[in-house]
Every structure is written in C-alpha cells, then in structure tokens.
Curated annotation (Swiss-Prot):
One of its GO terms (molecular function) is proton-transporting ATP synthase activity, rotational mechanism. F-type ATP synthases have 2 components, the catalytic core F(1) and the membrane-embedded component F(0), linked together by a central stalk and a peripheral stalk. The central stalk, also called rotor shaft, is often seen as part of F(1). The peripheral stalk is seen as part of F(0). F(0) contains the membrane channel next to the rotor. F-type ATP synthases form dimers but each monomer functions independently in ATP generation. It is found in: Mitochondrion inner membrane. This is ATP synthase subunit delta, mitochondrial.
Length: 160
C-alpha cells in the first residue's frame, strides 16, 4: 500500500521535478552576487558578469542563468569579474555557494578578505607557527593547527 502511494505521488509530481528555470531579468547576462561573512556583508546583489569559485569539487565558473546548485567551498580565491572586465579577488576560508534561479549567487563564508590585504611574510610566519603546533600532544591544539595549515597553504598559493 505504501509503495502504491509513493508511485502515485511520483507519477503526479514528475512533471514539475527537474524543470530548469530561467531568470526573468531585465538584463539576462547579469549575475547578482552576494558575498557575506558572519561579521559583515562584503557586497549584496552586486551585478557582475562572472564569478569563479574554489569549490571542493574543483574550480568553478558561474555565469548568468547557471543551473541552480549548492557547492561547498574550499579555502581559496573567489574572483568576481564585473561587466567592464575588471576583477576583484577575495580569499575565503571555506563556506557555501548557492546558485539560485533568477541569476543569483549567494556566497556564505566564515572569513573573506580582499586578496591584496595579505602579505607573504605574515603568511610564512603564521604557517611556521601552525606547523609547530601540529605536532602538539594536545589533540585540540593539533586539530586547530591542521585547519590553520590547510587555510594558510591555500592562502600562500593564492598570494604567489
């Protein structure tokens, strides 16, 4: 009986599941992006032409009318390309990117800062300190150091 109910629901709803929706925007080539961290909104509904993301599954480019999806972000650089061609880069420590119908992209991250705000000397010293802490007998200190190392190595690669 339960299987029959599921089959009837599946048959009646199949027509609407999996339908791709497109934006009904004034400019179909514009992607509206929001980049937010818990302590600040870096920008909200900024109109751009493309955003490149450091997804956990690999680098990902997002344009207007992209298929809706949710992606986990790895530590890396979010590149925002405006319609004029100018690009701004932000380092994110991780988070999620939600690509929504209507050519909208919402990026939620724990930390996000302009890439040019970092100096390679500071990164090297922080990385050396984290590597020392990684061999700590205290499991909490070692686990935190492992996370720091992952983020700092990604930051170091992005700055160079």
């Amino acid at each position: 009986m339960f299987r029959q109910s599921l089959r009837s629901i599946a048959r009646t709803r199949t027509g609407t599941i999996g339908v791709r929706t497109y934006a009904e925007a004034v400019n179909p080539d514009v992607l509206k992006v929001s980049l937010v961290a818990p302590h600040q909104a870096i920008f909200t509904n900024k109109e751009v032409s493309q955003v490149n993301l450091p997804a956990s599954s690999g680098e990902m480019g997002v344009l207007a009318n992209h298929v809706p999806t949710v992606e986990e972000l790895a530590p890396g650089v979010v590149e925002v390309i405006e319609s004029s061609g100018t690009a701004s880069k932000y380092f994110v420590s991780g988070g999620f990117a939600s690509i929504l119908p209507g050519s909208k992209l919402s990026i939620s991250t724990v930390e996000a800062h302009p890439l040019d705000a970092f100096s390679s000397e500071n990164i090297k010293s922080l990385l050396a300190e984290a590597q020392k802490n990684a061999s700590s007998a205290d499991e909490t200190v070692a686990a935190e150091a492992a996370i720091e190392i992952e983020v700092l190595e990604a930051l170091q690669a992005a700055v160079h």
